Amino acid sequence: MSDYRVTLEAGWTVKDVESVQDAIGIAVSEAGKRLHPSAKFVDVDVMNMPCPYCGKEINTALVIARTGLVGLLLSMKVFKAENPEHAVHIAKSVIGRALRDVSLSTYSVELIEGDEIAE
């Protein structure tokens, strides 16, 4: 049995926003509130990707017609999983229970070495 850090990606919709920064702030806040009572150990971050023109890192957020779509990364440590697929299944179950109507997709799975567990 091994320990893993599982990161899932989610597309978060925010209504009635004027700017990308507002959409990001509201998305992170709403996700944090929904995760807090049952899964407060989940880290919430804004997803970044390289700009296709300059290669610089940009956030994955978009606002059209006062509706925002923000790419979020939700990561958690999963202890004593049988394999990476089992760790993903556990993470999706825990996070999915808190964020019922949000689609989740696997972003990354990393094996945690013995020293990193004590963080």
From Swiss-Prot:
Belongs to the UPF0212 family. It comes from the Archaea. It holds the Pfam family DUF555. Transmembrane segments: none annotated. It comes from Methanocorpusculum labreanum (strain ATCC 43576 / DSM 4855 / Z). This is UPF0212 protein Mlab_0931. InterPro entries: UPF0212.
